[in-house]
C-alpha cells in the first residue's frame, strides 16, 4: 500500500522541498519516492520546514523534476540488500545493482540508518591482523576489528594499497570484503571491478560506489550502504574487511549538503555537525562477540595539512594510521609508507611479542638516526662521518629499501610478481639486516623484494 502523498513545491539543485498534510509529515531520514515517468527518484528527508514542508536531499540527479509532481513517503529509511547474494556484485547508494548482471534476490533488506552495537555486545580482544605487507606488519600493525586510516595527499598510492589489501585478505585469509567508493574517480572504480574479476577475488567482495559525478546526497550516504552490508556479515559471525575510499569525500559531501540545507558553516567552512556525522558512522564500525569489522579508510589530506578539521576528526577514531609520504615516493620506494609517521596502538610487547616490538623499535631508531645524519651528509659528505655512523647510514638505507615490496595488483605495470611476506619472515629479515649480516650486499639488492633471502639472490644477479 502506498504511503502518504505530497507535492514537490521547490527544487534547488539536489535540494527538493515537498509539501505534505501537516498531520502526515514523513519522519526524518525516510526515503521519498518521486515517479518521473522514465525513472523513480529517491530523496531522503533531512529537515522539517514549517508545519507541512519537508526538505529532502536527492540521491540521484534532479534533471526533469518539476514542481507539482507527486512524492510518496515510503515510510522507511533507504534500505539495501544484504547477505551472500551481494558478493561479487556492484551497487549504488540505493542498493540497486549497476553491473548489468540482473537483479539481486537477497533474502533480507536492511535500512542504512541503524544503531551502533551496545557496549555489552562489543568485544575488545586485541589481536594482530597479518596483511603480508612488511612495512605495515612490522611498524604499524593492524588490529583485527580495528579502524585503520590510510593518510596521504593526491597520487601517493592509497588506492593501490587498498587493492593489495583486498587481494591479500581474500587469497590468504579467505575473508569477505566490502569496498565502498565514496566520491572517488569512476575510472578507478571501473579498473578495480575488472581487476578483481580477473584476479578472482570478486566472489568474496561486495562493491558499493557513489562516485565524484554523483549528487552530494549519494556521496554522503554511500558509506552507510557499504557499512550496512558489512554489518550483516559481522552479525552472522564473519570477519569482514570494510574499505572506504575516501572518507574525506564523506565529510566533503556532508559539507555540501550542510550548506545546501542552509546551516552556518564551522571551522574552515566545514559543517557544524562534522564530529557528530563522523561519530555516527565510525561507532557502527566495531567488533561484536559474533564477528568483526576491520575497516581501512583512505583519508585524503587537503594540501597535505594533517591539522585540517576533516583528517583531524577522523584521527580521533583510529587504532592505527598508515601515512603515505611524498618524500618516499620521490625516493622511488613503494608502498610509500612513512615508517616514522605511521603508528599503531597494538605495537605493544604484550600484544605482538617482545621480539616483534624490539625489532620495530630498533628499525625506527636507526631510521631516526639516519634522518639526523642527513643534514651532516648534505653539508660535509658521508666520508666525514665516524665509522659507527657510516655503518648506521649503510644499514638504514638497506632497511629503507627493504621496506619496499612488489604488489600483486601492480604486476601488470611493474612486471614484478607480487610478494606476500609473513610477519615471522618480516621480523627475521629486519633483525638480520640490523645485526649486520648483510653489510656486504649492495643496497639495491633490497629494493622490491619479498623475504630477505631474495636479497642474496638479487645481489648475485647484480654482480
Swiss-Prot record:
It is found in: Cell membrane. Gene3D superfamilies: 2.40.10.170, Bovine Mitochondrial F1-atpase, Atp Synthase Beta Chain, Chain D, domain 3 (1.10.1140.10), P-loop containing nucleotide triphosphate hydrolases (3.40.50.300). Coiled coil: none annotated. InterPro entries: AAA+_ATPase, ATP-synt_VA_C, ATP_synth_F1_bsu, ATPase_a/bsu_AS, ATPase_alpha/beta_chains, ATPase_F1/V1/A1_a/bsu_N, ATPase_F1/V1/A1_a/bsu_N_sf, ATPase_F1/V1/A1_a/bsu_nucl-bd. It comes from the Bacteria. GO terms for cellular component: plasma membrane; proton-transporting ATP synthase complex. One of its GO terms (molecular function) is ATP hydrolysis activity. Keywords: ATP synthesis, ATP-binding, Cell membrane, CF(1), Hydrogen ion transport, Ion transport, Membrane, Nucleotide-binding, Translocase, Transport. It is a peripheral membrane protein. Its EC number is 7.1.2.2. PANTHER family: ATP SYNTHASE, ATP SYNTHASE SUBUNIT BETA, MITOCHONDRIAL. F-type ATPases have 2 components, CF(1) - the catalytic core - and CF(0) - the membrane proton channel. CF(1) has five subunits: alpha(3), beta(3), gamma(1), delta(1), epsilon(1). CF(0) has three main subunits: a(1), b(2) and c(9-12). The alpha and beta chains form an alternating ring which encloses part of the gamma chain. CF(1) is attached to CF(0) by a central stalk formed by the gamma and epsilon chains, while a peripheral stalk is formed by the delta and b chains. Produces ATP from ADP in the presence of a proton gradient across the membrane. The catalytic sites are hosted primarily by the beta subunits. This is ATP synthase subunit beta. The lineage of its organism: Bacteria, Bacillati, Bacillota, Clostridia, Eubacteriales.
Amino acid at each position: 500500500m502506498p504511503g502518504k502523498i505530497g507535492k514537490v513545491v521547490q527544487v534547488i539543485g539536489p535540494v527538493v522541498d515537498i509539501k505534505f498534510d501537516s498531520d502526515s509529515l514523513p519522519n526524518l531520514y525516510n526515503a521519498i519516492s518521486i515517479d518521473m515517468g522514465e525513472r523513480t527518484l529517491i530523496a531522503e528527508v533531512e529537515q522539517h520546514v514549517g508545519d507541512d514542508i519537508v526538505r529532502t536531499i536527492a540521491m540521484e540527479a534532479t534533471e526533469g523534476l518539476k514542481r507539482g509532481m507527486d512524492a510518496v513517503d515510503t515510510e522507511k529509511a533507504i534500505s539495501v540488500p544484504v547477505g551472500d547474494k551481494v558478493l561479487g556484485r556492484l551497487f549504488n547508494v540505493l542498493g540497486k545493482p549497476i553491473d548489468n548482471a540482473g537483479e539481486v534476490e537477497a533474502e533480507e533488506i536492511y535500512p542504512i540508518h541503524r544503531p551502533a552495537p551496545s557496549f555489552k555486545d562489543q568485544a575488545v580482544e586485541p589481536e594482530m591482523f597479518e596483511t603480508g605487507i612488511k612495512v605495515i606488519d612490522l611498524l604499524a600493525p593492524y588490529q583485527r576489528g580495528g579502524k585503520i586510516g590510510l593518510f596521504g595527499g593526491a597520487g601517493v598510492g592509497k588506492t593501490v594499497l587498498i587493492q593489495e589489501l583486498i587481494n591479500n585478505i581474500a587469497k590468504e585469509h579467505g575473508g569477505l570484503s566490502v569496498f565502498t567508493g565514496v566520491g572517488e574517480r569512476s575510472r578507478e572504480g571501473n579498473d578495480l571491478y575488472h581487476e578483481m574479476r580477473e584476479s578472482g577475488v570478486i566472489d568474496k567482495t561486495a562493491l558499493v560506489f557513489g562516485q565524484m559525478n554523483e549528487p552530494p546526497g549519494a556521496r554522503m550516504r554511500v558509506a552507510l550502504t557499504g557499512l550496512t552490508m558489512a554489518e550483516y556479515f559481522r552479525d552472522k559471525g564473519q570477519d569482514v574487511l570494510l574499505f572506504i575510499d575516501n572518507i574525506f569525500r564523506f565529510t566533503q559531501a556532508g559539507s555540501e549538503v550542510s550548506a545546501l540545507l542552509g546551516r552556518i558553516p564551522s571551522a574552515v567552512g566545514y559543517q557544524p555537525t562534522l564530529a557528530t556525522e563522523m561519530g555516527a558512522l565510525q561507532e557502527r564500525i566495531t567488533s561484536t562477540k559474533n564477528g568483526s569489522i576491520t575497516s581501512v579508510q583512505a583519508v585524503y589530506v587537503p594540501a597535505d595539512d594533517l591539522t585540517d578539521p576533516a583528517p583531524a576528526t577522523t584521527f580521533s577514531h583510529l587504532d592505527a594510521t598508515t601515512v603515505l609520504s611524498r618524500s618516499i615516493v620521490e625516493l622511488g620506494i613503494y608502498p610509500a609508507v612513512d615508517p616514522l609517521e605511521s603508528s599503531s596502538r597494538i605495537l605493544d610487547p604484550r600484544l605482538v611479542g617482545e621480539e616483534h616490538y624490539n625489532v620495530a623499535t630498533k628499525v625506527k631508531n636507526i631510521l631516526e638516526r639516519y634522518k639526523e645524519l642527513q643534514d651532516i651528509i648534505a653539508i660535509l659528505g658521508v666520508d666525514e662521518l665516524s665509522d659507527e655512523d657510516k655503518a648506521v647510514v649503510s644499514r638504514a638505507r638497506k632497511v629503507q629499501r627493504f621496506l619496499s615490496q612488489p604488489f600483486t595488483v601492480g604486476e601488470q605495470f611493474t612486471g614484478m610478481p607480487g610478494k606476500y611476506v609473513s610477519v615471522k619472515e618480516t621480523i627475521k629479515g629486519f633483525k638480520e639486516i640490523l645485526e649486520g649480516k648483510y653489510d656486504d650486499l649492495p643496497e639495491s639488492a633490497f629494493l622490491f623484494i619479498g623475504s630477505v633471502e631474495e636479497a642474496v639472490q638479487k645481489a648475485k644477479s647484480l654482480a
